[in-house]
């Protein structure tokens, strides 16, 4: 009793909670303490209070109880017992014994059994070596708020080491390898930060059993017989911070199996040894409060991933894999997780040549590995409960994709066995500095894979309820833009998981194209025209561009699904139905391998496409030549011989079938040699019909005639900002099967026998576009003569011309003097005269099919008002008119009332342009009264730029303007207009109600920052 009493202060300070509980258990078994007394001691939160309580209880119970207390103390903390008796165990061990033990450890850390490890578990016979495959990790030090505050290297971490140090990271981040590396570095003696440690012990906590001493002996090496357990524990106390414990995997540790290791972490102040412990994110909450330093393992760097791949794979396989990763943004993101790098390499191992595996294959391997690797953790869990939890995890992922949710709450996992999802590694749990826990998949792409896997199982289930559920998810995908963006990865992994699921997906996508939202675009690609207007305004450039963007992205999505599918040939019929009538864009500078597979394995699908768009770029050659000139022309023999890559030739020319239509675009060619022309001829021959576009190609001059001679099947030609010789122009007008001709920015002099002289030869033309072409009055007259022969033309654009005298009079007369099929006429900024407008007005009865009439940006001088009046008065014959943009002149605003009266009879009008009409408050009120009657049911575009309306006038107009619910575009630009605050407020209210608005032009309106803050919305606002 006196011994305990005399040493009570030391006992209270040094026993520790773990030893107190162990002694309490012994005393309960020996009937010294009853259950109530045990509860009192164990419920104490402070270890000193617990120690004080048990000592006072024992002293009251007499000497026999005190002897039993000392017996238990001797068992559980022998070094403390010896110290209290005035005996030190440490002196019993010689320095030589310690040196021998340290050397044995160092030797162990350099043996093959320690350096070689199974990165995917012992069931898979793939071995990595720690020396050659370790890459420098990225570590982040965390503060008390659990925020990243500093990036650390491994050496930086060791130099700043505090105990306990907690290293957290999601599964597969390389935490175990990191601790093994530290042990190896200590053993080598080459790491300065580790030389201060006498011993470094690496322990796997999943295998910890018994006491600390027993675990060390079991996992590392047999400690010499001269060092007993009590002596060893005393040595640890004596060496203090010269001993480093590397404790791997607290998330797999069972504290009851080894209370001493638990105490080493949570009561580190008693042991005084240094500790680094790793854990997964979801288990961090169990030890975070005890950490003196917390570090997170960050993403693997791209250089580290490449180094690892090159180290573990033979050169050919490594280069193939690195090329595949370079082409895939998704794979590049996944390579930030070391385990995924390992899996990607492992799939290639044993192969004689590189095989480009699909992302589904990689994720499937990863998913199954997680389940297999952690199956031992689920003993006692019923198989049905386990499967139900996995299904719920898939449902969670699937719902998350559709609701754009990638962070989940407790209620989301409350209906299943949370432990199953966490221990398999499918979900990660985040609790640090959070009132409510957050659950996430380790990567967004992994959530999409899990969702796709689940959708596949639903679509192929034998249970009708599950099939209905799966089809319900497909029915939510009704917009092409959503399918090609939001749901593209989900569909990819669904198709990669099952042939039958792919069949269901492709049938749905074919139905979407037929009946769904074909023209729905993502916000970043919203069209100027809404879908409804496109149905009424036919053959417009806007419509064609919009459809091309949508259909191309849709087709690319289909090819990716084909690529991902587990069986290509079995689904040929479904894929062919999907590709029927669609288009595909190909960049010749980056033709992916899967296109060759697509053409080879599904030739019927490729030929089912409506047309292929192929782009060639000459800029690389031009820049190379400039560099050669800058260096005096050195190494000219190394210049590439052709612009046209042979890869493009092999893709098209080696193909055994024909495309319906091929659209080839040449851009920025500084020259075109004979081999290029031969290559183009081979490519052109792969299509039944050809469209050729030439943009900014100075080098085509003189060669275009040769190019066209290889085009036996061309029906559309567009030349933009590319000079032409007289031979080129003559050859263009000799291609009599042309249906579309578009010439832009052609500024060389018109020569006899050239373009304007001979356009009449192209009698099959249906569309003629001439923009910014240099010509004089004589050229215009010749052009007019040629137009008389173009009886099939339905679209004519003549824009941005100058100095053509009275040439427009002749052109307008040729266009309108006889009944024709013209549906669209654009005569924009082309010296249109009042006389030409009169001629047009008098001949409107010959243009009854006209849908779009654009005469904007033309100033009518003499007799302009009279001409405009006459045009307006005769407009009643244009029963299909949907878009009207008028010219301007002096006092044209006087014609507004007459115009609006006629427009009341044109309910299908969607676009009206009165640019530079200089409308005043009077006219804007007249216009407001017109719109107040709501005569135009689907009105969408209004251009009143160049007005003179005051704030009062605009305020009056706003009351009606806000009712134009279908509006997508307006232009109210003017000069130096300072709007009143009341107008700004009203404008902001109106704009918020125009939910379809995509662009508002208010150039010249003098807004300050406050004004802009209230009128800015989801639309594009142009003020300068």
Curated annotation (Swiss-Prot):
Binding site for ATP: 169-176
Mapped LRR repeat ranges: 578-598, 656-679, 735-758, 762-785, 787-812, 824-847, 848-870, 878-902, 911-933, 936-963, 965-985, 999-1021
Family annotation (PANTHER family): NLR FAMILY CARD DOMAIN-CONTAINING PROTEIN 4 (PTHR47688:SF1)
Name of the protein described by the UniProt record: NLR family CARD domain-containing protein 4
PTM-bearing positions, type Phosphoserine: 533
InterPro entries for this protein: CARD (IPR001315), DEATH-like_dom_sf (IPR011029), LRR_dom_sf (IPR032675), NACHT_NTPase (IPR007111), NLRC4 (IPR042220), Nlrc4-like_WHD (IPR053882), NLRC4_HD (IPR040535), P-loop_NTPase (IPR027417)
Chief location bin: cytoplasm
Expression sites (tissue/organ): Isoform 2 is expressed ubiquitously, although highly expressed in lung and spleen. Isoform 1 is highly expressed in lung, followed by leukocytes especially monocytes, lymph node, colon, brain, prostate, placenta, spleen, bone marrow and fetal liver. Isoform 4 is only detected in brain.
Superkingdom in the source lineage: Eukaryota
Disorder this protein is connected to according to its UniProt record: Autoinflammation with infantile enterocolitis: An autosomal dominant disorder characterized by neonatal-onset enterocolitis, periodic fever, and fatal or near-fatal episodes of autoinflammation. Affected individuals tend to have poor overall growth and gastrointestinal symptoms in infancy, recurrent febrile episodes with splenomegaly, and sometimes hematologic disturbances, arthralgias, or myalgias.
Pfam families given in the database record: CARD, NACHT, Nlrc4-like_WHD, NLRC4_HD
Complexes and interactors: Homooligomer; homooligomerizes to induce formation of the NLRC4 inflammasome. Homooligomerizes following activation by pathogenic proteins. Component of the NLRC4 inflammasome, at least composed of NLRC4 and caspase-1 (CASP1). Some NLRC4 inflammasomes contain PYCARD/ASC, while some others directly contact and activate CASP1. Interacts (via CARD domain) with PYCARD/ASC, pro-caspase-1 (CASP1), NOD2, BCL10 and NALP1 (NAC) by CARD-CARD interaction. Interacts with EIF2AK2/PKR.
CDD domains membership: CARD (cd01671)
Keywords: Apoptosis, ATP-binding, Cytoplasm, Disease variant, Immunity, Inflammasome, Inflammatory response, Innate immunity, Leucine-rich repeat, Nucleotide-binding, Phosphoprotein, Repeat
Origin species: Homo sapiens (Human)
Lineage: Eukaryota, Metazoa, Chordata, Craniata, Vertebrata
GO terms (BP aspect): activation of innate immune response; apoptotic process; defense response to bacterium; detection of bacterium; icosanoid biosynthetic process; inflammatory response; innate immune response; pattern recognition receptor signaling pathway
Compartments reported by the entry: Cytoplasm; Cytoplasm, Cytosol; Inflammasome
An annotated GO cellular component: plasma membrane
Residue ranges of the region described as Winged-helix domain (WHD): 356-463
